[in-house]
Regions:
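Short pre-catalytic strand/loop immediately N-terminal to key active-site residues, enriched for Gly-Thr
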Residues: 16, 202-217
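Short, small-residue alpha-helix embedded
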Residues: 148-149, 213-236, 240
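Glycine-rich beta-alpha junction loops
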Residues: 15, 42-44, 86, 112-114, ...
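Conserved phosphate/ATP/ADP-binding segment of small-molecule kinases
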Residues: 120-203, 234-237
Length: 276
């Protein structure tokens, strides 16, 4: 008898144009034979990275009502995976999901900033709200900027792997498993990587050659592969390696000159993910 697919509740924004957030998370997890139940924190005409001011639809009452409906139906979630929140109050929505499904594997991608700055449009109350949410997670996946924001450290420029590893270790006081992404100061800047840490365990690092192009949405693809691989039984380090390799493959499958704001050509790379 074939085992039923694992089921993930993905609490993220849904952009219509541009490959990011739920528009890449759903196909990635489906390719990994993981069912995704999408709970949009906002519906946007585009993602928020360089495509102008998107049209936005937000319904604060929808999320809590949807969770209660799923709970009444007896839906079982193996994982709850959150990302972009439209405002600090939405952290309560994710916490509600954690409380309704306490046995689910809880993953938080603390979307706060990148490139050494807090994302525009996020209020000062978002950092403490995200910190509180991370403290209730099993695994958090910040980039180097978000790691600094969560820890109250100076915002980084190009950090070293050693600095990121120290931050990851400190963040295990917040959540038991941590993966810090976007570490660029590796091998004289020739590589980009991630560092992982587990409470009471040894740290690890994964690197891939640094690509000269920077696409929006690759962090969402990375985290989705990471979640999918863990749910399929991979240990975190192996899941991180698979996620980093697939992001590199997505970039290779995207032609030179493609508009980086629109994200990688995920459609070309998904068959490779299914084969792995």
């Amino acid at each position: 008898m074939t085992n039923a697919p694992k089921t993930v509740l993905a609490i993220h924004d849904l952009p219509g144009f541009g490959r990011a957030a739920l528009s890449v998370i759903v196909p990635v997890l489906s390719t990994l034979s993981v069912q995704t139940v999408a709970l949009p924190t906002a519906v946007l005409s585009t993602h928020t990275g360089g495509l102008g001011t998107p049209a936005k639809l937000a319904n604060p009452g929808y999320g809590p009502a949807a969770l209660e409906h799923y709970h009444r139906l007896g839906v079982k979630f193996d994982c709850i995976y959150s990302g972009y929140l439209a405002d600090a109050a939405q952290a309560k929505l994710v916490e509600q999901a954690f409380e309704l499904w306490p046995r689910a594997f809880k993953v938080v991608d603390p979307v706060l900033g990148d490139g050494g700055r807090l994302y525009s449009g996020l209020g000062a109350d978002m950092v403490p709200a995200m910190y509180s949410l991370c403290s209730k997670a099993d695994l958090i996946v910040p980039n180097v900027t978000e790691a600094a924001l969560l820890l109250g450290d100076p915002l980084p420029g190009v950090g070293s792997a050693e600095q990121a590893a120290a931050q990851a270790a400190r963040l295990t006081r917040v959540a038991p498993q941590v993966v810090v992404t976007g570490v660029t100061g590796i091998g004289g800047g020739r590589y980009i990587g991630c560092v992982g840490a587990a409470r009471g365990g040894e740290g690890y690092a994964v690197k891939t050659p640094l690509q000269p192009r920077m696409f929006h949405g690759t962090g969402d693809i990375f985290a989705a592969v990471l979640v999918g691989r863990i749910l399929r039984g991979n240990v975190p380090q192996a899941a991180v390696q698979a996620a980093a390799a697939f992001v590199a493959e997505c970039i290779r499958q995207t032609p030179e000159g493609a508009d980086e704001r629109l994200g990688v050509w995920l459609e070309n790379a998904l068959p490779k993910l299914r084969q792995e």
